[in-house]
Amino acid sequence: MPKKRLIGEVLSDKMDKTVVVAVSTLVKHPRVGKYIKRTKKYYAHDENNECRVGDIVEIVESRPLSKLKRWKVERIVERSVFAEKAPEEDLEGGSNNDN
């Protein structure tokens, strides 16, 4: 049986080798017939910590890796605009006031 594949957006990359991916699907309401957007979060394994918040990624089903992780990041479909630019911070820690 082939493994399931989903495409979603990275919501969080704060954990080591783990990302939270939001996958949106459209489901039809049984009585009304209207399509409703449903979003589900998946914890996915990111071996090299390559994913950043806002990236569009493809995740694939895998064996259980922890209590919550059952998916692996297969590839990064599209990089986020914000992920490409790393913020340059003042490493000296001083303020700009020279009194």
Swiss-Prot record:
Q: What's in the keyword line of the UniProt record?
A: Ribonucleoprotein, Ribosomal protein, RNA-binding, rRNA-binding
Q: Which domain of life is it from?
A: Bacteria
Any one Gene Ontology molecular-function term assigned to this protein's record: rRNA binding
Q: Give the GO biological process terms.
A: translation
| GO CC entries | cytosolic small ribosomal subunit
A family per Pfam: Ribosomal_S17
User: Which PANTHER family does the entry mention?
Assistant: 40S RIBOSOMAL PROTEIN S11 FAMILY MEMBER, SMALL RIBOSOMAL SUBUNIT PROTEIN US17M
Role played: One of the primary rRNA binding proteins, it binds specifically to the 5'-end of 16S ribosomal RNA.
Q: What do we know about how this protein assembles, alone or with others?
A: Part of the 30S ribosomal subunit.
Q: Which family does it belong to?
A: Belongs to the universal ribosomal protein uS17 family.
For this entry, the protein name equals Small ribosomal subunit protein uS17
Organism classification: Bacteria, Thermotogati, Thermotogota, Thermotogae, Thermotogales
